[in-house]
Amino acid sequence: MALLQIAEPGQSAAPHQHRLAVGIDLGTTNSLVAAVRSGVANTLPDDKSHHSLPSVVRYTQEGVEVGVDAEANSAKDPQNTIISVKRFMGRSLSDIRSGVQDLPYQLETSENGLPVFVTEQGKVNPIQVSAEILKPLVSRAEKTLGGELEGVVITVPAYFDDAQRQGTKDAAGLLGVKVLRLLNEPTAAAIAYGLDSGQEGVIAIYDLGGGTFDISILRLHKGVFEVLATGGDSALGGDDFDHLLYQHLLNQWQLASPSATLSRRLLIESRRVKEALTDNIQVTASIKLDDGTELTHDVAKATFDDLISSLVKKTVSSCRRALRDAGVTNDEVLETVMVGGSTRVPLVRELVDKFFGKEPLTSIDPDRVVAIGAAIQADILVGNKPESDLLLLDVLPLSLGIETMGGLVEKIVSRNTTIPVAKAQEFTTFKDGQTAMAFHVVQGERELVDDCRSLARFTLKGIPPLAAGAAHIRVTFQVDADGLLSVTAMEKSTGVQSSIQVKPSFGLTDEEIGTMLKDSMANAKEDITRRMLAEQKVEAARVLETLSAALQKDAVLLTESERSDIEQAMASLAQISSQDDADAIEKAIEALDASTQDFAAKRMDNSIKLALKGQSVDSI
């Protein structure tokens, strides 16, 4: 008897893949789960036909509410209802409070500086809250697909740093879910649009979600998906539009100190007005006060545009920087892909269209496009598409390196390097008999450690006690596909090694994300001057250290006059190197070198004499 092939309308009759994997867009405002079924990628609805799950979690004495129910009760119970938790991921409490005012939560700081929400269910951190959002998405997928998932691909903003990425993986880990990969949201969007299928050239992905903004410049060439440059802001999104409108309404209604409940209702109303202004030139905002009084105010589209104009222009400035970093011009960009619900705002589309000089792609629902791309990638990673030649090459947004003598930065992996990547460099000891070496891993573009971001410190012990410069320590930086860094230091002769996986206690602050690159360009000339000075000071210290050891060992080879001349030159170098004149230090080193030429020759002669002592010509 022949088997009937049954497929859903509009889909192929190919049987469902036996390896179950999904893509999850863990968003600031809403989250979605998508899968490839019968060869077609699409988001999966819940039993009420809702595709998106509000990223809202409410903690009560009875239990935990997630999604629509939590959102519905958020106005009456704001202290126990966590919204936009993605903005808290991997960031310090002080950083969060400096960026967003009027938070209704009772917050505490954990031992490592991370925020903790105090709720009726007890204390929870952003990772645990994120896990609660992931839980119904995973459950929905397994119920719909009819089996246990082999893994998930979770999308993150390209600008997420190590702490934020690790927090996202840890949230999935709390559920026992295997993370196949963290995928940058803009890259996922490009996959969803099928821009890898035959098209070649430069693509811009403009991703403005609820809490984050990313711009990625991609080059597509013969199946290779390379990210040329990334930029953005991990604390700029539609939520900020809501807060600006919220502040505007507070001012119009002269509400100086609204209660937490009223504040939440007003924020919800601000979001409704924002969304309604997408298709209307004027919308009436209304709110009922705690005493029952109802207030109304007409908000014109022009007024809303004025409120958000500076933020939208800020995203365009990021686009300009990303193009410069990628080494391409506006004219070279073939397509501009719009991602994220906030790209529905007319002013956003208008300014992006104007900047790139072409109408952006919006045919796929901007709220679903990222999850769909993640599903396609998950399908590939579990082996359901072995014929796929899609290759994703993400890049590092900031350089990684280590501190060297004098507080200098030696960059090991440069900014915009394609990942995954492994790079190594050899270093040596500074002092005779040195048996340990401390490593300080830093991130940034500046020349001095003080101007970069500290990531981690570790120590390599067990180095053979050799002369300065004789030991060889190989330092290897490895960055995996998720952008997580591990650093290993190994002494080559013994094989002794030490390593560390970098998981910063919290992420970059808003100011750091926006200014690190600008600072490096603005201070480039001054940084080089400071580096040259530091290098001369390190060299002076090395020369003095080496010469002091030589005098202690072989001073008998010198006359009193010769020794006095050398010591005077050493004192002069020591005095000059305490000042900030690189040229003077260099000249003092040269003067000391000239005064020690005869001493060096005498030491060489003496070493040869000692080596030949007691040996015959025949034995030599």
Curated annotation (Swiss-Prot):
What terms describe the molecular function in GO for this protein?
ATP binding; ATP hydrolysis activity; ATP-dependent protein folding chaperone; unfolded protein binding
Gene3D superfamilies the UniProt entry points to: 1.20.1270.10, 3.30.420.40, Actin, Chain A, domain 4, Substrate Binding Domain Of DNAk, Chain A, domain 1
Q: Name one GO biological process term.
A: iron-sulfur cluster assembly
What's in the keyword line of the UniProt record?
ATP-binding, Chaperone, Nucleotide-binding
Indicate the secretion signal residues: none
Disulphide bond pairs: none
Q: Which residues cross the membrane?
A: none
Entry annotated with the keyword Transferase:
no
What does the function comment of this entry state? Chaperone involved in the maturation of iron-sulfur cluster-containing proteins. Has a low intrinsic ATPase activity which is markedly stimulated by HscB.
Name the family. Answer: Belongs to the heat shock protein 70 family.
Q: Which NCBIfam families match?
A: HscA, PRK05183.1
Spell out the PANTHER family in the cross-references: HEAT SHOCK PROTEIN 70KDA
Q: What is this protein called?
A: Chaperone protein HscA homolog
Organism, per UniProt?
Shewanella woodyi (strain ATCC 51908 / MS32)
